[in-house]
Every structure is written in structure tokens, then in C-alpha cells.
């Protein structure tokens, strides 16, 4: 009988037009105490972000079919191109999760983190300058997931529904309630042709006469609304053009996936045709004396793309054209992403 190793180390690399160059390393032990406990140390470095996290998971907490664990993390993000500031966070989270059925599971998570808005430029919006410095977030969240997809990559049928409710307050300096919902449905029309339709929406509201900081608001554009730049849609300072985030958002997408004519199926190339819509609006920026450009107008973009499941990982190129937009929106026609692990 040969004993198999339960530890592994992996490396990753990637690039996207929204996140820049990315690289990561992960060290994992899947049987720490001989009962399937998992511990993982991960480091992700990018031109616009850095993430370090240590996680531990007990798969059968209290001898039940319930997972529990913790995460310790530090993140930093360069948002100079979006709103002339950078931000970081350090903290920990406690979590537990269990399955109700084959397709339904629930996750409860408590997070305590200290965030910092720094490197604020002198020409940044008054809203950004007023929020420079540290804040503490104490957040309790609950997520329910219903997943009937046949596969996670190149899905041909099934649903994915996810709803998260979070409340921040208690020992923290931030007081807000937030909910987000995502839904997508996949259906094969005929051989190798799949249509998917989906949507998302979110709301975040303050309480106790507080305001919601930039890093707790929603931003729209890039990966979640093609045809528009990262944070290209939503409330914006009329003078500095800084993106200020919003309290309310929604998106919808319809996408057709199909084989490319004359290309052998074995090469793994797929064509994409899509329509994305969405909007982001509402914040408290006016209380800082800023003149804010804001609108609930639905933005619409349509486009084509190519996806290749290469030996080095998935590669995708999209070209989208905004059809409906506001004058102050920032657009981005091409999106490119590549990622692999080895």
C-alpha cells in the first residue's frame, strides 16, 4: 500500500485588461490532523492588487456534516486610475457551512477587518479626501447557494442562484445593511450551442446616521458590465471625474456560446455573442460638498468574443460596443483575460 501525499504547492499566472498582470502561489495541506482538515497559505501579487491569506477548514465540525474554519487576510488595491486613491484591509473571518441537499448549501460568516484609504491625491474628489484614513468593519453575513450546473467550466445546462445578506455594526465604526443576489441559467439549444441568461442586483443602506465608505459601496464596469471601463458606470464627481460608487445596482446578461465554423472541436475554441445591461446609482456624496453626476439610466452594450480552453488555461477576448450610455461614463471596448495554474 502506497501512502499518497496530501500536500501540494501550486503556482499561477494571468493577465486581464481590468486587473493587470497577476501571479500567485498557494501551499496547501489537505489532511493536517489526519481527519481531512485543510490549511492553505496563499499569496497573490498583481500590478494593481496584492492579497495574502491563511485559511483553515475543519470538514466535520463537532462530528457533524458541517464545515467550519477561519481566514486571516491582508489585501491592498491601487485605485489611482479610478478615483485617485489606494486602499487596504487586514482582518480575520470565522465561517461555517453546510449542505441542505445535493444542490443547496448555506454559509454563515463573521468578518472583522480594519480598512484604510490612503495615497489620496491632492486633486482627488472631496468625497475621497474626506474618507482618507482607517475604519473598522464588523460584519455578519449569510449566503444561500442553489447550484444545479452540470459543470463549472463550459456549462451546458442548469441554474446557479446565490443570495447574500450582510449587516455591519456592533464593535465596528461602519453601520450598514447589504444584500446581493445573482442568478444565471444555462440551456443547450442543440449540439455545442448554449444560451445563458442571468442577472444581479444589490442594495446597501446605512443606519445610525452613518455614511457608507467607498470600499463598502458597489462599483460597475469591466468584468460585470462589458463595454465599460472598471468603475466606468455610476456616480461620478463632476469636477475630478472620480468614480464614487453607488448604493444600488443591477445587471443583466444574455450570451450565446457556439463553435466557430471550420475550426476543429478538439481545439476548444468557442465564439460568444452577448448583450449586457445595467445601472448603478445613489450615494451620500453630496454631504461632502461634491457636485455628483448620477443617473438610473439603463446602460446597454453588445458584443462578440472568443474563448479558448488552452493547455495553459482559459483565454478570452471580448469586444463590446456601448449602445446606451451617459455622457460621463467611461468605456472600454476590448477585454482580454488569461489565467493558468501549474
Regions found by a protein language model. Give the residues of each.
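Gram-negative/organellar outer-membrane beta-barrel architecture
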Residues: 1-161, 226-227, 231-238, 314-316, ...
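C-terminal outer-membrane beta-barrel translocator/porin domains of Gram-negative envelope proteins
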Residues: 7-18, 111-291, 328, 336-341
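Short, glycine/acidic-rich beta->alpha junctions
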Residues: 48, 88, 175-179, 297-298
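C-terminal structured "cap/appendage" subdomains that terminate the fold
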Residues: 282, 287-330, 334
